[in-house]
Amino acid sequence: MNGKLLALSLFSLSISHSVISAEINLYGTGGPHHALNEIVQKFKENDRFKDIKININPGPYTTWESCAKGLDKSCNTGPADILWGTSENYYAVLEDEFKKYGFTSKRSKSIYLRPAVILVQKGNPKHIHGIEDLINNPEVKRIVVNNHTLKSVMSATALWEDIVGRKGKLEDVEKFRSKIVYQASGSGTAAKAFLGNQQQEKTDAWITWPEWYHANTEKADMIEIEPDRVIYRDLNVSIKQGASEEATAFYDYLSSKEAFDIFQKYNIGK
């Protein structure tokens, strides 16, 4: 009897330790991480998952690639269980780069859409109401955009020219192009350029995604892009083959109504 009790006690301790030490690691580009962090807290309200550690690791691809692949043993978090991408061109990179690490298109899905928006300085001092103002308003002289560089991967690659060139007018592209003062290789650096500092003047506008407004509501206003010009990119997620039951549950939860309600707060929808 004592032996059985001891075995049962050790089994219970093992289960308890397993629940407490369970960990899910997500990696992806910055922006959606604001909503994801909030979704993690909502997910953990379920007693079944309250003790799980969920690590949201956002940033430029090159800053987390080796950690997500498990190649860098100095990383604070383990290899990726879930990857998120912020466009299909971004997903194509993830699919190609992580196919040796258990990620395939069969275990991925598009879950939401994000509209491109214009961020302007708080109070909208240049009275910007859409792309037409960025093109034709002579008072608008300093614009920052995101764009792909040789060592970067991003959802906003060629975004500005898709929007500005939407009507097939070369003149629109030429006018807008002449006002670009910085093409950033990531949203983090673009945000810094937009907001300015003691050494760098603020810009009048930044074409970006709505979650960057929600991260800077005290410093910026958000302007919607005209319906005949607005471009959307999807938010997609992929889960590793053989992922844990907990990781699979969170992956599924990202498509739930509860998660959707949170994403909507950041202007990410369907």
Whereabouts are the PLM-identified features?
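Bacterial N-terminal signal peptides that target proteins for export
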Residues: 1-7
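Early extracytoplasmic/lumenal segment of secretory-pathway proteins
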Residues: 22-94
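Ligand-binding cleft/hinge of the Venus flytrap
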Residues: 41-48, 131-185
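Ligand-binding pocket segment of bilobal, Venus flytrap-like solute-binding proteins
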Residues: 64, 159-227
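A conserved helix-loop-strand patch within extracytoplasmic ligand-binding domains
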Residues: 89-152, 156-159
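Periplasmic-binding protein-like
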Residues: 113-115, 146-148, 214-252, 254-270
